[in-house]
Amino acid sequence: MNSGNAKLIKEIKKWRKIMKYKLIATDMDGTLLNDEHLISEGNIEAIKEIQKKGVKFVLASGRPSFAMFEYAKELEMVRYGGYVLAFNGGQLIDMKDGKMIFHEGLDWDDIRKIYELSCEIEIPMALYGEDTVYASKDTENTRFEAKLCGMKFREFGSLEELDGYGIKETTKCMLISDPEKVKKAEEHMKSKYGNEYFIAISKPIFLEIANKNINKGKTLRQLGELTGIGMEEMIAVGDSYNDIPLLEVVGMPVAVSNANEEIKAKSKFESTSNNDDALKTVIENFFR
């Protein structure tokens, strides 16, 4: 525990006595995963241990579900009945039986509007098929997204071409560029479509656009209703702007030490960094 958390020792002991947490939901990139996009052995063992004790574990990411399953299997979430909350809440999957509990996304008209705006501000748009990332421009950053997700990559030059690939809907779209352009794109997108979509920067080069009725927090709340676990009985861990809805709905919001300041301001506890067993630190502080 870092010095900034030292003053919270007494509070943690009090929280342990008052509340028995039954679920942990964590972001992946920048939180659970280290900078090599791996789960540390310390995190793996700690997460398996609490699942053995009956605590439910949820992977909550902006990633497509396709890019989350291997991590879920590594954590034995199939065995223990964990959940994958993908696309920032656009999909919720029960790993025990592989069933899709919830899905909500963007239709063709949404895709068209976002694509036209991306052309207007000259920033590539990407969206997701079943196993392929489709991007309006082949760049290092758009290919990086496909590589990060373990998906195929295909460039499209027009909506007609995209339609030809059989894409009629998607769970989310992304505008992908350098951080300065992405920040400007966020401002432009929110000024034009802020009331129509959920818009958030997940990583400096990624602006995510999804159905306005979804975010990580709303979908986690649905999971709480399904399982009978109260929101006050949940811990959530995150590092970036798309994690804010997640942190706002749980009893114990946690930021990793590498999180931005806005995320830290939303948290009650600061864990170690994503490169220093952040989830293990959370588990040691709230379950032992």
Regions inferred by a protein language model and the residue ranges of each:
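Conserved acidic, metal-coordinating active-site core of Asp-based
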Residues: 117, 121-237, 244, 258
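Short active-site oxyanion
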Residues: 54-58, 82, 172, 232-233, ...
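Non-catalytic pre-domain segments flanking phosphatase-related domains
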Residues: 1-26, 45-48, 52
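Active-site metal-binding loops of divalent metal-dependent hydrolases
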Residues: 28, 63, 238-240
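Active-site phosphate-binding/coordination module
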Residues: 41-142
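Asp-based phosphoryl-transfer active-site loop
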Residues: 22-36
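Short, acidic loop-to-helix structural element flanking the phosphoryl-transfer center
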Residues: 37-54, 103-110, 157-158, 211-225, ...
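Mg2+-dependent phosphoryl-transfer enzymes with acidic/Ser/Thr/Gly-rich catalytic loops
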Residues: 19-23, 40, 208-288
